[in-house]
């Protein structure tokens, strides 16, 4: 008969200490080894936030209903454990083992599950019912999580939410994903052989390297998804080598249009370039171009026309986007730390005028914008949920109609900025 592993039978504190948790884990270890005095870890509805179980053996342990936000669970073994309705948001689950674990109703939003093993785990809906209320159960939430290289072979994940998750090279073979939501997720080179995907939503997903034959016929919504069949125009089809076109473009900029020619890469798939770090591409035109995952650190793209471009998961730290048109561009999971989206100023009719950066209708979910400058930037009707604007200069920016759910604004300058509801800073 399982016994809670509470030392000396004392009641656990509301917020458990690391030393108390370590003591329980040691008792559980003895239990799993069949040693005298061992007790199975049964911790239910406790607050373990911020603690560590790194590399610990927690097979068959019970953490049902626990708050486990921001915990370091990397390398831990939760094989056949119960994490029913747990809150694992922002936890480090790198290479964590959840084989045959009960994760029904768990909330795993923004967690790092890179290399985690969830083979045959139960990821169906779940929730707690009390005498006062009935909870029909919530779906497992992986929104924005990093599942790169994770194994979910044979898992039960009907109606699970993987929106905006990083799922490159994930193993979903034989998984039950009926009704699951993958909108905006990166499934590059994912293995979906034998997966049940009836009714799944894969709108705007990245599916390059995925066998579409394993998806077709399942009633999956692939609207606006990127596949090997529609990646866009190839740079191989350019009439002139790209290096020469860039040279002509820079000459065009330097002579204010008198010589050379503006570079137009609209509709091209540029991911094959891998890196444009430090490049000077002022006034580039690239409407609807695809840059996903590229290293563009310190790139100069002032006064460029980049609306509807896809910058998901790009490294754009220190990038210069001043006065650039970025309407309806995608930046989810992009690294935009210390980037500059400020205006450029020019003289016209004896007056100083500002050319601002426009990001109306853009998607910046989960983007890291810490320390960036967005002075007078227009974010009208943009989706900025979970974006990190810590320490940003947002003076005079326009957030009218923008979704700022769970976005971080700690230490941000918001003087003169327009919000439907001002955020806490």
Residue locations for each model-derived region?
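N-terminal acidic, proline/glycine-rich, low-complexity intrinsically disordered segments
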Residues: 1-7
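Tandem repeat scaffolds
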Residues: 9-22, 29, 33-425
């Amino acid at each position: 008969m399982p016994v809670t592993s509470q030392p000396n039978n004392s009641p656990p504190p509301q917020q458990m200490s690391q030393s108390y948790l370590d003591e329980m884990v040691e008792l559980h270890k003895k239990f799993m080894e069949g040693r005298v005095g061992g007790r199975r870890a049964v911790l239910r509805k406790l607050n373990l936030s911020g603690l560590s179980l790194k590399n610990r053996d927690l097979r068959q342990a019970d953490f049902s209903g626990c708050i486990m936000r921001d915990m370091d669970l990397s390398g831990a073994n939760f094989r056949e454990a119960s994490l029913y309705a747990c809150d694992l948001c922002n936890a480090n689950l790198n290479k964590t083992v959840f084989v045959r674990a009960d994760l029904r109703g768990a909330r795993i939003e923004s967690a790092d599950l890179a290399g985690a093993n969830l083979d045959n785990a139960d990821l169906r809906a779940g929730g707690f019912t009390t005498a006062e209320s009935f909870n029909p159960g919530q779906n497992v939430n992986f929104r924005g999580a990093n599942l790169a290289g994770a194994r979910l072979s044979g898992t039960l994940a009907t109606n699970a939410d993987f929106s905006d998750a990083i799922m490159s090279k994930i193993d979903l073979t034989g998984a039950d994903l009926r009704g699951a939501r993958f909108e905006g997720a990166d499934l590059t080179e994912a293995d979906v052989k034998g997966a049940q995907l009836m009714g799944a939503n894969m709108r705007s997903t990245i599916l390059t390297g995925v066998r579409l034959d394993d998806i077709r016929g399942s009633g999956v919504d692939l609207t606006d998804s990127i596949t090997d069949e529609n990646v866009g125009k190839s740079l191989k089809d350019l009439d002139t080598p790209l290096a020469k076109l860039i040279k002509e473009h820079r000459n065009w900029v330097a002579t204010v249009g008198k010589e050379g020619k503006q570079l137009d890469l609209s509709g091209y798939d540029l991911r094959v370039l891998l890196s444009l770090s430090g490049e000077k591409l002022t006034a580039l035109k690239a409407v609807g171009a695809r840059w996903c995952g590229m290293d563009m650190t310190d790139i100069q793209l002032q006064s460029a026309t980049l609306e509807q471009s896809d910058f998901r998961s790009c490294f754009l730290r220190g990038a210069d986007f001043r006065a650039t048109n970025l309407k309806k561009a995608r930046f989810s999971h992009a690294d935009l730390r210390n980037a500059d989206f400020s205006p450029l100023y020019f003289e016209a009719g004896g007056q100083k005028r500002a050319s601002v950066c426009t990001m109306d209708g853009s998607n910046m979910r989960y983007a890291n914008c810490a320390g960036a400058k967005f002075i007078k930037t227009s974010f009208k009707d943009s989706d900025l949920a979970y974006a990190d604007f810590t320490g940003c200069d947002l003076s005079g920016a326009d957030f009218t109609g923008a979704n700022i759910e769970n976005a971080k604004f700690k230490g941000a300058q918001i003087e003169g900025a327009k919000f439907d509801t001002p955020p806490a800073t």
